[in-house]
Structures are given as C-alpha cells and as structure tokens.
Design a protein with these regions (language model features):
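Conserved G/P- and acidic residue-centered "switch" motifs that form tight phosphate/ATP-binding loops
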Residues: 37
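His/acidic metal-ligating clusters that form di-metal
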Residues: 128
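ATP/NTP-dependent adenylation/nucleotidyl-transfer catalytic domains that generate, transfer
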Residues: 1-32, 42, 46-49, 54-77, ...
Length: 292
C-alpha cells in the first residue's frame, strides 16, 4: 500500500506536470494562498521553479502569492508566510483586510452578538479566503493552486467550499510525511547553493507546528491526539491495509523511531478518518435513472 517514492523524482514530476498543464490550457498565471505552513511552502517552491523555467523557455508566466492573516493567525505563521512569499513568488502581497471582512461575517453568523464556536468561525474564514483567492485569480486571468495532501484528505482536514477548493493541486497524493521529506531535500539544495533566503524560508516553515491558523485549535496534533504526522501516516497506512480486520492491535511500531503507537491514538485517528467520509464523497447527487 505505502510504496516509497523517489523524492527528487517526485519534485521533478510535479514541476513538469504543472508546466505541461499551464501550456496546454494557455494559462499564464497562478495564485497561491500562503499560510507559512509546510504544504503551501512546498507548492510555492515548486511554482517558483515552474515560473522560472517557463519564462526561460519564452512562455510568459507569473506566480502570485497571497497571505491573508486574521487575528487567529500566529505571528510566527505570518513571519514564515512572508519569508516564503518574498523568496519564491514573482508577486507577493499580505492583505490585512481579511480580519475586518471575517469579523463582519462571523458577527453576522452569530446574529450580531452571539459568539459562535471556533469550528464555525474557522470554516467561515476559510471560505472567505477562497472568495478572495478566486477573485484574485480572475483579476490576473489565472488559476488557484491547492495545497491539500493525502493525509489531510483522509482526515477531512479541509473546509468544503474553503481550502478544499482549488483548480490544480500537484501534491494531493503525497502523504504529509513525504511533504516534510521533500521540503527537507529542497532546503538542503538551496543551502548548498548558498541561496540562504530560500533555504531559511523553507527551514522556518519546517520548524512550525502544523496548524490551521483559523483559531480552531492550537495545532493539528491537538485535534488528532498524536505525536506528529509521521505517526498519523503510519496509522492511516496500517488501517488502509487492515480495515477489514476487527479491532486494533495493542500498538503498532512507528516507522521513524520505533515508538509503540498505542491503540488509543490509532482509534482517534481512524475515527476522524471515518467521520470525515462525507467530505471525500461530496457533493452527492442522484442518477437520472432514479427518476425514471
């Protein structure tokens, strides 16, 4: 089930596939929402290479990056987003008006006085961000890039109508642990080239705890109840291979450090996967034959 990939080859495949797609569809611009997290950082690095290569080949292309912070965005997230945006985007902006817009919408959802729970307000912010990104993409005649990975897809770590929306996502089939490993290699490559701003930007992103930046929880692991995403990947891979077997073993062994991942943690992760199944089968429609 979990076949090891060649990380360097994976980077090249993603770059070449995006170049081919942009040319085929006559697209000359792409927009990426940059949070400072490792997922948007990887897409930013790849898109930087795509833009460089396309322009060097005589194909005009512009890569736009946008950071849309709110009051629930940690300062270290914004700092990482700025480092990544300035290092890898052809054009980068921080739009600080997102907080004002999201405050109005959240107040409206709470009937102008009732404080709504963090999950609802977080979903609203995620959807507002996509409104902005898609409008931005329309303005520059481009498309919106996605940053979801396979682990988050299986966990339902996205908002329907929000960050689950995108036009092109080069890394949907990568496990989160693979995203980390590819970024580590890219960071080392830039360090070897003495391109320290780019190396530092990736390193800063790697050092951040994965979080949604929407105020839903302190970080992803608080929501999941695991040590880190490497354990989560081990659990999900075990489950996909053994989902027909009843119950869980007392533990499984971490592929990283030999830690015994307990059944309690496995149960939390697998329940989250099962409870988010509707997100992976959305939207639901009826076939025409049902009406006849």
């Amino acid at each position: 089930m979990n076949q090891t990939i060649d990380y360097s080859k994976a980077s090249r495949v993603m770059i070449d596939s995006m170049k081919e797609y942009f040319k085929k569809c006559n697209l000359h611009a792409a927009v990426l929402g940059i949070s400072g997290g490792i997922d948007s950082t990887l897409v930013a690095v790849l898109m930087h290479k795509v833009s460089q290569e396309l322009n060097s080949e005589g194909y005009s292309f512009t890569f736009y990056g946008v950071s849309l912070p709110t009051k629930t965005t940690y300062s270290k997230e914004l700092w990482a987003a700025q480092l990544v945006g300035n290092a890898f985007c052809d054009n980068f902006e921080v739009n600080n008006e997102m907080e004002e817009a999201s405050s109005v919408v959240v107040d409206w959802l709470g009937n102008w006085g009732v404080k709504i729970e963090p999950l609802r307000s977080g979903n609203a912010k995620s959807r507002l961000r996509m409104i902005y990104l898609y409008d931005f993409a329309k303005k520059v005649n481009g498309i919106v890039m996605g940053t979801d990975n396979y682990t988050e897809y299986l966990l339902g770590f996205s908002t329907i109508g929000g960050d689950a929306l995108f036009d092109y996502n080069p890394m949907q089939e990568l496990w989160k642990s693979e995203v980390f490993e590819i970024c580590k290699i890219l960071q080392e490559q830039y360090a070897d080239l003495k391109d320290y701003p780019k190396a530092a930007a990736i390193m800063t992103s790697l050092a951040l705890k994965p979080m949604d930046g929407l105020g839903i929880s302190a970080d992803d692991m608080v929501q999941i109840g695991a040590r880190h995403y490497y354990d989560v990947d081990d659990i999900l891979q075990w489950y996909l291979e053994n989902q027909d077997r009843p119950g869980y073993p007392d533990y499984i062994i971490s592929s990283v450090d030999g830690y015994k991942i307990p059944a309690k943690t496995m149960d939390l992760v697998i329940k989250r996967h099962k409870n988010s199944e509707f997100k992976r089968n959305h939207p639901v429609t009826l076939s025409r034959e049902r009406y006849i």
